[in-house]
Design a protein with these regions (language model features):
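A structural signal for short hydrophobic beta-strand segments in well-ordered beta-sheet cores
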Residues: 39, 63, 86-88
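A short, structured loop/turn motif at beta-sheet edges
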Residues: 16, 44, 65-69, 88-97
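Beta-strand/loop substructures that line and gate deep hydrophobic ligand-binding cavities in soluble
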Residues: 77-132, 137, 141, 146-150, ...
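Hydrophobic pocket/interface hotspot
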Residues: 19-23, 29, 47, 63, ...
Length: 179
């Protein structure tokens, strides 16, 4: 089975430290990403993920290669085999370029490889870019002073899994009345 890598990038109108802190609230991903249904923390270094990309897929991930305010990385330890890195590059004093690189082994063996070659991978990469753009829009639309990394309740996008009611019961319980 082959490993495939997909990338996306966006420049966000906020300083790198704020973007980094907001992005690393993984349990908020269902609020702005369309295919992430749940992210729950097992401890400070490991998390459980549920996604709906051509079917439902789950995995556990461990944090790797983190550099505060600059980079986050991960690799799966069970479930869907994947790993990746997200970098946060300051652009002047008030902007941040976010680069995402995600690599995975498609599930279903030869069928997964065939799907990747027939366009599933391209569609996934486009959705990854769209969701990253949603994150940038949400950060940009946040009122001045509301970019508090400890309070990200405003992070909802109309195309998100949360807004469409596609999150899991476990994820819903972490979002309280905001889902």
């Amino acid at each position: 089975m082959a490993e495939y890598t997909h990338t996306a990038a966006v420049t966000i109108n906020a300083p790198a430290n704020q973007v980094y802190h907001l992005f690393t609230h993984f349990n908020d991903f269902p609020k702005f990403m369309s295919y992430i249904k749940e992210v729950t923390y097992k401890d400070s270094q490991t998390s459980h993920w549920v996604a709906d990309v051509v079917g439902s897929h789950e995995w556990d991930a461990v944090n790797e290669n983190w550099i505060e305010h600059k980079q986050v990385g991960w690799r799966s330890t069970s479930g869907l085999t994947n790993h990746g890195v997200v970098t946060f590059e300051p652009v002047g004093d008030s902007q941040t370029k976010v680069n995402v690189s995600l690599s995975y082994d498609p599930p279903a063996g030869v069928l997964g490889d065939a799907g990747e070659k027939l366009g599933v991978g391209k569609a996934f990469e486009q959705k990854l870019q769209t969701d990253l753009d949603h994150f940038a829009q949400l950060v940009a639309q946040t009122p001045t002073g509301a970019l508090d990394p400890e309070s990200s309740n405003y992070l909802f996008h109309d195309d998100s899994a949360a807004a469409q009611g596609k999150t899991t019961t476990s994820q819903d319980s972490t979002m309280g009345d905001n889902a």
